């Protein structure tokens, strides 16, 4: 079998997509029959005309999707270092390694984000896309266990951009899709964007409406993997951390002294250098709170990067789809809601001989 026939068969088999949840139709409407009697009208996907001549109804090759996601992500932090500086002093502060004395409890991020995704089917089984979005609200709660109890709650927002690729196929009545994307999340508190990698595997059946071939409902289940760059560096203003400063900073100084005085003599010798640096840093911060800031660096990680997901999509017609998905188990719980519009650019199908 030559390479052209191999590509054609592969394209004909692997046309079921998660994004459109199109299965190979067994019966055509009058409109489908009229559609197949004409030349394939769109420039994409490559090999689209061959699949069209095999009377397989492809989704519109391009789309715009609007997504809204709300969720919760649990994290863990390690290798913490702090520095105390003033904006009026251009010299960077000396960083204090506090990883030996600081212990965190739960770090939880509650997020609300919106994004737009633009995609195109390059091949009948290969989709590429770009993402741009905004985190409207991320409430982050950090509970410090030692050297003294401290609960920090902060709200951040930011923008992100990214790209992704998805491949899809069919096994009997089930579709299977593998989706991988990377996003770059920008926040004014961070020196560099946070890089997030997400991979998802989904499979499920497609239910068509006999009297309305344009419409279908797709159900799926699957798993998702999340990973991001662990090293984080940033700056936070003193007033943002302690809005009632300097009284709040004075209270933390007292907590620091209480913690140190409660150590054994051997522990006091061991942690004396760190204690004195923190004491001096907090004291300087209290005296210049309007101009002060805290420099920080740490490593963050997801303890359980895998989570389960279930979802459903209602294809109203070939152009419009509504989707919902729930992500659970692992360290992530989230709900995703989407509206998708499909379209195509008319022209000679790329690499078609006709």
Residue map of PLM features:
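Transmembrane beta-strands of outer-membrane beta-barrel proteins
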Residues: 62-67, 128-130, 174-178, 199, ...
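Short loop/turn motifs that connect adjacent beta-strands in outer-membrane beta-barrel proteins
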Residues: 23-24, 51-62, 120-125, 170-176, ...
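Outer-membrane beta-barrel transmembrane domain signature
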Residues: 183-317
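Short glycine/proline- and aromatic-enriched beta-strand/turn motifs that initiate or cap beta-hairpins
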Residues: 22-107, 130
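Residues on the lipid-exposed face of transmembrane beta-strands in outer-membrane beta-barrel proteins
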Residues: 55, 66, 111, 116-124, ...
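Transmembrane beta-strands of outer-membrane beta-barrel pores
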Residues: 68-74, 132-138, 169-173, 180-188, ...
């Amino acid at each position: 079998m030559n390479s052209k026939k191999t590509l054609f068969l592969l394209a004909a088999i692997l046309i079921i997509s998660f994004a459109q949840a199109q299965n190979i139709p067994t019966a055509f409407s009058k409109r489908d029959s009229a559609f197949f009697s004409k030349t394939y009208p769109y420039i994409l996907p490559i090999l689209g005309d061959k699949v069209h001549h095999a009377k397989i109804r492809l989704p519109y090759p391009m789309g715009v999707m609007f997504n809204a996601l709300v969720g919760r992500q649990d994290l863990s932090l390690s290798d913490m270092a702090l520095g105390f500086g003033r904006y009026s002093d251009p010299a960077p502060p000396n960083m204090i390694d506090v990883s030996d004395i600081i212990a965190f409890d739960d770090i939880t991020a509650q997020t609300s984000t919106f994004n737009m995704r633009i995609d195109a089917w390059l091949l009948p089984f290969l989709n590429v896309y770009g993402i741009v979005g905004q985190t409207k609200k991320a409430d982050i709660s950090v509970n410090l266990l030692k050297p003294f109890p401290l609960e920090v709650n902060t709200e951040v927002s930011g923008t992100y951009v990214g790209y992704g690729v998805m491949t899809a196929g069919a096994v009997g009545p089930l579709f299977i899709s593998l989706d991988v994307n990377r996003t770059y999340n920008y926040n004014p508190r961070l020196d560099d964007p946070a890089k997030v990698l997400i991979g998802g595997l989904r499979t499920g059946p497609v239910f068509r409406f006999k009297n309305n071939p344009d419409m279908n409902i797709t159900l799926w289940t699957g798993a998702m993997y999340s990973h991001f760059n662990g090293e984080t560096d940033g700056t936070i203003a003193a007033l943002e951390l302690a809005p009632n400063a300097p009284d709040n900073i004075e209270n933390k100084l007292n907590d620091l002294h209480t913690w140190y005085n409660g150590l054994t003599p051997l522990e006091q010798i061991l942690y004396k250098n760190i204690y004195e640096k923190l004491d001096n840093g907090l004291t300087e911060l209290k005296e210049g709170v309007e101009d002060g800031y805290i420099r920080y660096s740490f490593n963050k990680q997801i303890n359980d990067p895998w989570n389960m997901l279930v979802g459903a999509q209602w294809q109203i017609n070939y152009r419009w789809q509504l989707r919902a998905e729930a992500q659970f188990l692992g360290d992530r719980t989230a709900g995703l809601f989407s509206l998708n519009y499909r379209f195509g650019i008319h022209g000679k199908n790329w690499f078609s001989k006709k």
